[in-house]
Curated annotation (Swiss-Prot):
Family assignment from sequence similarity: Belongs to the YPP1 family.
Keyword Oxidoreductase among record annotations: no
A Gene Ontology biological process term: endocytosis
Location in or out of the cell: Cytoplasmic granule; Cell membrane
Job of this protein: Involved in endocytosis.
Membrane topology: Peripheral membrane protein
The keyword Coiled coil is annotated on this UniProt entry: no
Xref: Gene3D superfamilies: Tetratricopeptide repeat domain
Major place of residence: cytoplasm
Entries under PANTHER family matching the protein: TETRATRICOPEPTIDE REPEAT DOMAIN 7, ISOFORM A (PTHR23083:SF464), TETRATRICOPEPTIDE REPEAT PROTEIN, TPR (PTHR23083)
Descriptive protein name: Cargo-transport protein YPP1
Alphabetized UniProt keyword annotations: Cell membrane, Endocytosis, Membrane
GO cellular component, one term: plasma membrane
Length: 739
């Protein structure tokens, strides 16, 4: 095949995938394909005005396709047909669409692109006759590659219009792949068993290929149908498909389609290990094709879809022997995604510009199914790295989310996570502008975004703006609760916004005023989460399977919050009772906050006991910021005045703690060992913990240690970090708006 032909086929492949940037080697063909892209771009947008279609028609009329290749004539026939349909001229629409019939010779030269043109053509016809239907079933001999998402878009629309009695598709159109796909798309009662019978019939006629033979085309195509059917929705599927897939593996050699159906089946039915093993088979077979075909995957979107679908599992093991490695799998996903964007010439926001969406935003329009996949892939990469410090600081997280927004700009969840990351990296002004412009203007009832906005505004010395936001949101949420319009996560948000209100009251009016409002929190909790006899495993108030996603954990958080307020008021007795109440909430799990809050309670009266509590918490969670800072306060109790001037304490730390009545260290050697341990813990926090890195107290105590060690260079750096993060510290951690 000549280079020119390669370039043309690749340009057609790009168009079938929904791409809009070409390089066929023919200026005229590129111009035609670009116009086709623009027409479908606006066709996907239901709000396109008539004037836009008129402009596009004028541009189309400037192209004299009658003198061009048949390929250009075929594309332009569809372009004019679509334009006249959008302008309401059915006569001209039908005239132009009819031209494709005279160009059927293209099917032999460009079968995959012909499938796109034919399906698009029939979808824009006012009516699809029996002969038209039969032509499609004859001409589209194989299911499109998943990469050809524009072809799939039209194929699904076409199948939705096919007139055929149930189970009669094979009889009426022959035993072709589209006939089986039609029944899978319709999914009428009994289709599971019908498809299983059809698949077994095909399997019974199949034998393992000889060395010079290929796998059975019909069995390969049926497994492509099966993969579509298994992925179509979450309805129950027969477990007998497992045997069918296993038998198919026995009569095929390194089949991409069979391995894809296998990984889909096991992913659907919860066998993580087998899903992962089949994913690796699928990847290896795809890589084999790539090595033999100039470095290009045969169906890169299918591969991207497989990785995204399987790696979304929450129970992924870190490794399965030497066969599977989680980190490597996500690196492969990242590489496949990048390769797709590069080869298919889709616009990306570079990492270095990703934190400034308002200045660098872009809109990437592709067929809906591809848009969902790309958005899911970007968001999955974000989800797996969002708790890691390095990708947070190097803008990897904003990079993933910004590109997810480019492809799916209406997804509020992605937008909120983007705003949350901006806040986490202390791009506060950008976060505030983004929240107001891109979320709250569009969805005014997004309570988590209001909470995040209030926390961002709380950084200002004047807390009035933050306080007004919180009070307004609490009122709106109370009204929504009365009307039973609060979602599960909203109820958790409601509690934490109320706690934020109390912290603001404490800052603005004093701890006594906050304590007077404490009873309102308990009343709110009782209203949102009334006592019930429902089995806890089925508790509808749970956010997820983890202990910190239960309402008991939330109730404990309220008691710990109360204990901290009492500590800040110097009321040790009530603080102790609040901790005891937290312990009594549940015995199904252990909450480290019991140890940490006890540690702060004992800082003055029982420093050795406080040391034990903090050490116990750190043995389970070495980067727990509150425990590390508590340990530091035992080592540097005289720093309280200085620290108060440099960094506002977190709610748990509160006001300055008096110097302990007794020294928790037996001698100077004992203290030196504790300082060495504290140094390791603090440095671990700033190297691994997002919370720790942005906590001014962590940097302050590091500066004290560097001063003690006469490390002037790191001392100065730590002090600057302490001051910077003090100036950007919210009234409560941003994590309290993320559920």
């Amino acid at each position: 095949m000549s280079l020119e032909m390669d370039l043309i086929e690749w340009a057609l492949n790009l168009r079938a995938a929904g791409g809009g940037v070409f390089g066929s080697g023919s200026e005229e063909l590129d111009r035609v394909l670009k116009l086709h892209y623009r027409v479908t771009y606006h066709a996907f947008d239901r709000g396109t005005k008539r004037s836009v279609w008129e402009v596009l028609l004028a541009e189309a009329e400037k192209i004299d396709s009658s003198k061009g290749m048949e390929l250009e004539q075929a594309v332009m026939g569809n372009v004019f047909g679509i334009l006249y349909r959008q302008l309401g001229d059915e006569t001209e629409c039908a005239r132009w669409l009819a031209k494709l019939g005279a160009l059927r010779a293209l099917r032999g030269e460009y079968p995959e692109f012909w499938a796109l043109l034919l399906l698009e053509n029939v979808c824009y016809r006012e009516a699809i006759g029996v002969e038209d239907q039969q032509q499609v079933f004859r001409d589209v001999a194989r299911l499109p590659k998943e990469t050809h998402t524009l072809t799939w878009f039209y194929l699904e629309r076409f199948l939705a219009r096919v007139q055929c009695e149930r189970w009669q598709a094979v009889k009426e159109f022959g035993g072709v792949p589209l006939a089986y796909l039609l029944e899978a798309v319709r999914e009428e009662e009994g289709v599971d068993q019908w498809l299983l019978e059809q698949g077994r019939a095909i399997l019974s006629r199949t034998r393992f290929p000889a060395a010079s033979e290929k796998n059975s085309t019909m069995l390969e195509e049926f497994h492509a149908v099966l993969n579509y059917y298994l992925r179509k929705n979450n309805k129950p599927r027969s477990t007998e498909w497992e045997g069918f897939i296993t038998d198919s593996l026995g009569v095929t050699f390194q089949s991409v389609n069979v391995s894809k159906a296998a990984l889909t089946y096991y992913r659907r039915f919860g066998d993580t290990k087998l899903a992962l093993l089949n994913l690796l088979n699928f990847f290896n077979y795809s890589e084999r094709f790539r090595r033999m075909n100039n470095g290009f995957y045969d169906d890169i979107v299918s591969l991207l879809d497989a990785y995204t679908f399987v790696l979304q599992l929450t129970s992924l093991p870190e490794a399965i022997g030497d066969i599977f490695n989680k980190a490597k799998a996500f690196e492969q996903l990242r590489n496949i995604l990048q390769e797709f964007y590069r080869d298919y010439r889709l616009q990306q926001i570079p990492k270095e510009h990703s934190a400034d969406w308002l200045s660098n935003s872009a809109k990437v329009v592709v067929p809906p199914k591809l848009a969902r996949l790309l958005s899911d892939s970007w968001f999955l990469l974000y989800r797996i790295e969002r708790n890691s410090l390095k990708p947070t600081l190097d803008f990897s997280l904003t990079y993933y989310l910004a590109n997810a927004m480019c492809i799916n700009p209406l997804n509020i969840d992605v937008k909120f996570h983007y705003a949350y990351v901006l806040a986490s990296i202390r791009r506060i002004d950008m976060c505030i502008r983004f929240l107001k412009t891109n979320i709250l203007n569009i969805k005014p009832a997004d309570y988590r975004s209001w909470h995040l906005l209030a926390l961002c505004e709380s950084i200002q010395e004047d807390k009035d703006v933050s306080f007004k936001i919180v009070c307004s949101v609490l009122k709106a949420m109370a009204e929504a609760h009365e009307e039973s319009n609060l979602l599960k996560a909203d109820k958790w948000q409601f509690i934490h916004i109320k706690l934020t209100q109390l912290v603001l009251v404490k800052e603005m009016f004093g701890v006594k005023d906050a304590l007077e409002m404490l009873s309102e929190v308990y009343q709110l909790y009782a209203s949102l989460f009334p006592a019930s006899k429902v089995n806890k495993t089925k508790d509808e108030s749970r956010l997820g399977p983890a202990h910190n996603q239960t309402k008991e954990y939330l109730f404990q958080a309220i008691w710990f919050f109360s204990a901290r307020l009492f500590l800040q008021d110097g009321d040790a007795q009530n603080a102790r009772e609040a901790i005891d109440e937290a312990k009594r909430v549940t015995d199904t799990f252990t909450n480290l906050n019991v140890n940490i809050t006890h540690g702060y309670l004992k800082l003055h009266c029982d420093p050795k006991g406080a040391m034990s509590e903090f050490q116990n918490a750190l043995s389970f969670d070495p980067t727990n910021v509150d425990a590390v800072v508590g340990l530091a306060k035992l080592l540097y109790p005289e720093d309280q005045g200085s620290l108060e001037r440099i960094a506002r304490h977190r709610p748990i730390i509160g006001t300055a703690t008096p110097k302990p009545e007794s020294d928790p260290f037996a001698n100077s050697k004992d203290r030196s060992a504790a300082v060495a341990q504290l140094k390791m813990l603090l440095e671990n926090c700033i190297e691994k913990s997002i919370d720790g890195y942005h906590t001014p107290e962590v940097w302050w105590y590091l500066s004290r240690i560097y001063d003690e060690f006469h490390d002037n260079e790191r001392l100065e750096s730590a002090l600057w970090q302490c001051i910077k993060f003090h100036e950007l510290e919210p009234i409560r951690d941003f994590k309290y708006c993320m559920f």
